[in-house]
Amino acid sequence: MNLQLDYFSITSFLVFLVVLFRIVSDWKKKSTNLRLPPGPSKLPIIGSVHHLIGMDVDLPYHAFADLAKKYGPLMHLQLGQMSLVVASSAKMFKELMKENDLAISQRPVPYVARVLNDAGRDIAFVPYGDYWRQIRKISRMELFSVRKVQSLYYIREDQSNKMIDAIRGSSETVMNLSKAVSDYTSTVVARAAFGSGCKDQDKFIKLSLEMVAAAGAVSTLPDMFPALGFIPILSGKKAFLQNIQKEADKILDYIIDEHIQRTKSKDYDGKESDKEDIVDVLLRLEKTGELEIPITTQDIKAVIWSVFAGGTDTSSTTTLWAMSELMRNPKVMEKVQAEVREKLKGKKEILEADIQDLPYMRAVIKETLRLRIPGPLLLPRETMEPIEVDGYVIPEKTKILFNAWAVTRDPELWENPESFIPERFIEKQIDFKGTNYEFTPFGSGRRICPGMNFGIANVELPLAKLLYYFNWQLPHGMKPEDLDMTAKFGVVCGRKNDLFLIPTPYNIEGQN
């Protein structure tokens, strides 16, 4: 017994020494005389991690913004074995995402994505190369083109009507708006991804939401210290994620097979249709034989996971932050409701075609994306070669973070940046399509989010209906300034706590 214990102890100690030697060796290799961007001092093994102690690490974009005030808008940190550069100004965003876009077109695949997505076959983390070019073209031309997004209007109209009916059932009582909006967005994304005939749709939605939540809770330690990849294994989080994925994969296998069988029927003509879902589109393209790289079942699954991870939480989070800010700012609420109700005067049913001329509501959405950006650090990039930015050298394989949260609160760019003022987007035409570097909620350049049109469409119609059909009150006599606005950082940065409000039906007939 003692011999076994001694053998185990000696073996564990030797493994620890090997891991320690590798970490120190890697650290020494990276300690070169390159003119790196300024940053906090570094210690062996842990690098700059100790500087984050005592800072708001639950909201890392706060911590990075605080450090940037001392070290500048282009800052280098060594987080364990991860070499990281953080950009925190619109000027640095432009230098990187425009002038060096090609050189930083790679995405580092985080530990969670490696566990779940077959080494980055999904849209977000697919490595830069031929397959990325193909899936990017498919995304922009087929899956999320303006025409395709518009063709899915019937799904948004149907599901938003169901959401409004459910809210009517809670009239004059405290109801969970977070759940209502999340249910709407998840179902819209599911129907767009694989249609409405799936018997396990609700189960898949539940599993996907569980996976997104679990993925956001997985430690980043394996990315900072690859040798510590055993931690999620010991904690059970890796197995938990894989079990969810395994269960969801069974549903996706059934869905994809059902779609394949449909393509074999005599009624299938192989032509493009406005009622095609994402699986239909991918199978149609594969069947033409025109794709340079064949699409596998695993690739289709990865695309679906990308759509759910990027499309559900982002849209619902934006809608809920918009409603939260409107409840905190009654004058803005009054103004946007007046616009919506004047434009839609007397309508009992609102169609998507009815909401095309609501400039102030669109300004409310933009201001929400500025003040409550769902992805405050955007998705990281990685240098494929050494680059020079602002006189500094950034080595190959350096991860780059864009602190969009810091940029959207820069007082040199935004007057009263902490205040919710939609008028700023009326007075100055600023778009979110990646050319205004002070406002990049969907990123910019080659790796800009291809689904931004889809995401915005999933916000506009439900928000217009919430504003048109109901007057809203805070529960329990709460004052606007008392509304909890605490954020929670994860895959997206949403409300930490659900939003509970009291809806009162608006008298539409009284408008006439």
UniProtKB/Swiss-Prot annotation:
Broad class of the protein's primary localization: membrane
Cofactor(s) required for function per UniProt: heme
Family named by the database record: Belongs to the cytochrome P450 family.
This protein's record includes keyword Nucleus: no
Entry keywords, A to Z: Heme, Iron, Membrane, Metal-binding, Monooxygenase, Oxidoreductase, Transmembrane, Transmembrane helix
Enzyme nomenclature, EC number: 1.14.14.-
Residues where heme binds: 449
Catalytic activity reported: tirucalla-7,24-dien-3beta-ol + 2 reduced [NADPH--hemoprotein reductase] + 2 O2 = dihydroniloticin + 2 oxidized [NADPH--hemoprotein reductase] + 2 H2O + 2 H(+)
Lineage per the UniProt record: Eukaryota, Viridiplantae, Streptophyta, Embryophyta, Tracheophyta
Top-level EC class as recorded in UniProt: oxidoreductase
Keyword Transmembrane helix appears in the UniProt entry: yes
Transmembrane segments: 1-21
Pathway connected to this protein: Secondary metabolite biosynthesis; terpenoid biosynthesis
Protein name per its UniProtKB record: Dihydroniloticin synthase CYP71CD2
